[in-house]
Amino acid sequence: EIKSGIDFVLDCVDFDQRVKSADLVIVGEGRMDSQSLSGKAPVGVARRTPSAIPVIAICGSLKDDLPDFPVAGISAAFPIIGQVLELDQVLATAKENLYRTGLNIGNLIKLSKTL
């Protein structure tokens, strides 16, 4: 039997059973672009996530060739890079950028519960 890589991995970790109790699924991608919609891991995870559970993506950068979200089962995408930087600067600040993005997403979730 031939399976896609993401389906193999999700089966190995019993994803379908584990995701049932999730309130939110967060996927990651280095750079999200139109090619990401053609079978890369984030879309594979979104495809296997029940439709009642939102999926968001955290990515290094978002390319402008993507359609507006939601798309391919992903409700929203958040790039961690807020400005144009040289690669060495991006890599040097990755931890801080990821932390800041996660904090902003957490704040957005808290805010949504008060609306």
What are these language model-derived features?
Residues 1-115:
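N-terminal loops that bind phosphate or other acidic moieties
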